[in-house]
Amino acid sequence: SIIKQLEKKHQMDIPYTQAVVHFEGNANIDCNQYLASLYEAILNQQCKQIYYKPFTKSVRVYIAHPYLLKEYNQRWYLLCGTQESVDTPIKIRTLPLDRMVKMNDIPVPFVSSQTAFPDEEIGDYFHNIIGVTRKDNHPIQDIIIKCDPKEFMYISTKPIHPSQRLIPDKPNHIKLRVQENYELYQRLLFYGDKIEVIYPQSIRDEFRKVLQGMLSKYHNK
């Protein structure tokens, strides 16, 4: 952990009587029981049988070839190749650990990401998105955002995404280069009226619908 790294760097071995680092907690810790097992499965290239329960659907059972663990917004996700049976093609999926209801070892040969998805660099799978939702039929595009001056100072020092760049000839404007997805919408709506999406029009249209829906819930109440 980073605490162990700091202790090693500063040669510290001190029995603390009070906390000196505070981590943002997460009330939903059910997924923790699977973290270590999946981490070892990735290192050892071992398949798992995962019972996965989407919020609005029945349990699905996958043969999983685990490739990568990712944390986003206080949730853990597994990027893996999945099969419904040993005879079906491998499909890439991102599964939230807190929707896993059961997991077993399974004696199925592990198929590496390089073999299953030769055109995909798994380490870069999430590179062009915010969050974990990637849609192969959606293009990566520029997102132009105008910020209030005060919010611009905050966003310029705490980027929304690694692709974020300032626009030299447009004060208080930034540019992202990402794929549109639900997490992008969530992240931008977080800033409320402190920002305006200038481009693309598709996001402006989406936000207009969201805001109209919000207004209908609060209007005359």
Located regions from the model:
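Polybasic (Lys/Arg-rich)
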Residues: 122-221
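Loop-centered beta-sheet repeat module
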Residues: 39-86, 91-93
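Residue-level signal for tight coil/turn positions that link beta-strands
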Residues: 66, 73, 97, 169-171, ...
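Flexible linker/loop signature enriched in Pro/Ser/Thr and Pro/Gly
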Residues: 84-123
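Bulky hydrophobic/aromatic content
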Residues: 1-53
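Short beta-strand-initiation
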Residues: 33, 59-65, 140, 171
